[in-house]
Amino acid sequence: MIDTKALINQFDEIKSRLAIKKVSEETLSALKDMALKYKSCKQELEELQAFQNKTSKLFGEYKREQKDITALKVALDENKVKMSTLESTLKEIESHLETLAYGIPNLPDDATPEGEDENDNVEIKKVLSPPHFDFVPKEHWELGIANGWIDFEAGVKLAKSRFSVLRGMGAKLNRALINFMLDYNEKAGFESIVTPVIVNARALFGTGQLPKFEEDMFKVDSHFCDEQSEHDLYLISTSEITLTNLYQDSIIPSEELPIMLTAQTPCFRKEAGSAGRDTRGMIRQHQFDKVELVAITHPTQSAAMQEKMVQTASEILSELKLPHRLMQLCGGDLGFSASNTIDIEVWLPGQNCYREISSISNTRDFQARRAKIRYKENGKNALVHTLNGSSLAVGRTLIAIMENYQQVDGSVMIPEVLQKYL
């Protein structure tokens, strides 16, 4: 959630920076007007509270001195009614303000290049050269079926399209990748966590999936919830949600920062906006495994932490000897919660192109403001910065291994670094 105080004081600058994310001036003006209304109402309420306190003190003095308290009593009663009415109004305004603010994306930071879409992203560097084949390389779905690693028909039979079943060596490699990634992340200083894969709406508001992206979330049937539950429940689309929200409504001593976490979970997405895209294979699934990195930092640490997270994910691909490149996303291609994002794209010979395998984002204080995550330093509280990124998407890493390690006879070699995990 953006800082509404900053919006009031720096409206033109924020309007300009959010224009690249297609936020209209009318939308921001409506938010600014509501923020000013909230500020005015709150100030008026504080004045009434100050009057109430001052008059109550005077009322006590008059009573002790046996002076006439009739006028003071009337003033206090009338002021109390005004306060009650204004408190209700303030709550209503606050609710409207939050509704508007929750729909506004994060500001691109100064290091994010200008641009409209993925075509304007900037390549930072390539790591490892793509392999040369003396034959036409196959796509992963052909290799997966031929080697008995992937059963797409079984996924459809058990669920629907965009689900698949891994078998034999496919399942073993999937497990090996998860263990390898978690081990590597731990060595880089990230603490392993196991979290639920079902969360309440409060958690999704905290990290920015709700309210804007509810159509892409799998919602748990209300019959699952007990009658006393006040929460809608959802399957997570990423463990960024659970890892970040472990610290919602927290005040963290500054000396405990940074907090660095990693987790592996299944992730669930409806892919509502992806009709017709990547319909074959495992590139875009409703359920997939992902190993995630999340960091909670002091504001001065977040840029360096993003570099560390990118380095960690890139090193995993290098250990697997998978060619990849780092891409700096332009403002128009940034996600809703991101202020700065570096994508890692892995080379897929069967598709003859690079495909995203990780997005590592610095959200600065955007999620922290929504989830109310603060740190205490020198007796004062301030918002932390939060970062998240895949390290890595397991299914896409498996795809990359199949395509980069394929042999002329259709078999697939196993990366040396994974062999001890099998």
Swiss-Prot record:
Give UniProt keywords alphabetically: Aminoacyl-tRNA synthetase, ATP-binding, Cytoplasm, Ligase, Nucleotide-binding, Protein biosynthesis
Q: Does the keyword Acetylation apply?
A: no
Which terms in the Gene Ontology molecular function aspect does this entry carry? Answer: ATP binding; serine-tRNA ligase activity
Provide the reaction this enzyme catalyses: tRNA(Ser) + L-serine + ATP = L-seryl-tRNA(Ser) + AMP + diphosphate + H(+); tRNA(Sec) + L-serine + ATP = L-seryl-tRNA(Sec) + AMP + diphosphate + H(+)
> Pathway, per Swiss-Prot/TrEMBL?
Aminoacyl-tRNA biosynthesis; selenocysteinyl-tRNA(Sec) biosynthesis; L-seryl-tRNA(Sec) from L-serine and tRNA(Sec): step 1/1
Question: Record's superkingdom?
Answer: Bacteria
Compartments where found: Cytoplasm
Q: Binding residues for ATP, per the UniProt record?
A: R269, K270, E271, E356, I357, S358, S359
- Report disulfide bridges, numbered on this chain: none
- PROSITE patterns per UniProt: AA_TRNA_LIGASE_II (PS50862)
**The protein's role, per its UniProt record:** Catalyzes the attachment of serine to tRNA(Ser). Is also able to aminoacylate tRNA(Sec) with serine, to form the misacylated tRNA L-seryl-tRNA(Sec), which will be further converted into selenocysteinyl-tRNA(Sec).
Name the chain's protein.
Serine--tRNA ligase
Which classification does the entry list for the species? Bacteria, Pseudomonadati, Campylobacterota, Epsilonproteobacteria, Campylobacterales
